[in-house]
Each structure stands twice: as C-alpha cells, then as structure tokens.
Amino acid sequence: VENDVKMFILCNPYNPIGKVWKEDELKQIGEICKKHHVLVIVDEIHEDFVYGDHVHIPFYNVDESYKEFSVVLTAPSKTFNLAGLQTSNIIIANEKLRKVYQETMNRYGVNEPNFLGIIACMTAYNECELWVDEMLEYVYDNFTYFDEFLKENLPHIHLVKPEGLYLCWVDFRECGLDKDELEKTMLEKAGLWLD
C-alpha cells in the first residue's frame, strides 16, 4: 500500500507450499485490499487439493463485497489433468471489470474457447466427483508412504505435512548442515540439483 500497490495476487491454496488460507486470513487480505482499492486476482486452480481438516474457502464466499474488486481464476487442468486442452474459468462478478477484460480479449483475439476443452471441463465438473475423491486419496497415500520412508530410512529428514497441493516439502534442519553443505550433499550424493 505504501508503494501504491494496484494489484494483489492471492493463490489459494498457496502454490508452491500448499498453505490453505483460513477464513479470517482471507478476510484480513480482503479488507486491506478493499480499503486501499487494490484489485485482487485470486488463483484458485488448486482448490480441490486440500487435505485433513483444512477447507478451501472461495474468496467470493468470504464477503459479498469482495466481488467488486476481485477476479477469480479456476481451471480443471490440475484436478483433472486437462492442461493440454487449455481451458480455464475466469469469474468476474463486477460488470465494469468484466467489460474491460472482454474488450481486452477481443482486441488481442484470444477470446475463442477450445470447444473440446469446454466439453471436458463441463464433464469433469459435473460427472467426476468420485474420480476426484479417489485421486486425492491416492495423492495423500503418496504423502503417507513418503513420510514413512523418511522415518524408517532418513530419520533426520521430516516431511512437512501438506495442507493442500500435491508437492512434498521436506525439513532438513536436523541434519546439521548449512545451506551450502546441504546443496553440495544433495547434488553429489542424491543427484538432485536445487534451484
């Protein structure tokens, strides 16, 4: 706000760490952005990847007024592995913002939807709930397997239990290595190049 911020990008769950934002946290973000007239772009593409007691709360559900200064992005690409169909959903409740968006898309000629992608998107959202449940169970079972593997074979390395997403994060602090030593060990012994 001090730097004349015009837009805030909110990723929920937060990629790449998998944090699932709680309602009070979303409310705090929303109120700050509303007060300072900041446009919020809400990336909810990973909304289905939530585990345990964590719940994905759509930004629009936190407060009806947030629809006036936000744009929500979703897609079937992550949950249903449909990225190749290049289909996504852009939800713009504010008519003025939607008009600006539509005019911009028309000007650049990127407003033609992928017909096959639309059918796949509708089918995924309307008929594949069982598949989503089974996929989430499978992904979470992978976390459990990896966690057990670490406990049995590398007890100084711990899985950071995810709230959401499908990425594994591991905690190396108990290994007693500084950053440079850890990077060298990962490269030379594990064959893993760190970015």
How would you name each of these model-derived features?
Residues 41, 71-73, 160, 193-195:
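Structural detector of well-ordered beta-strand residues that form the stable sheet scaffold
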Residues 64, 68-140, 147-148, 152:
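Conserved core segment of the aminotransferase class I/II
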Residues 33, 63, 150, 186-187:
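A generic structural signal for well-ordered alpha-helical segments
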Residues 1-52:
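Active-site phosphate-binding strand-loop segment of PLP-dependent enzymes
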Residues 157-158, 170-195:
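Conserved C-terminal alpha-helix-loop-beta "cap" of PLP-dependent enzymes
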Residues 35-36, 66, 190:
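Helix C-cap/helix->beta junction micro-motif
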Residues 122, 137-147, 159-172:
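Conserved glycine-rich beta-strand-loop-beta hairpin in the small C-terminal domain of fold type I
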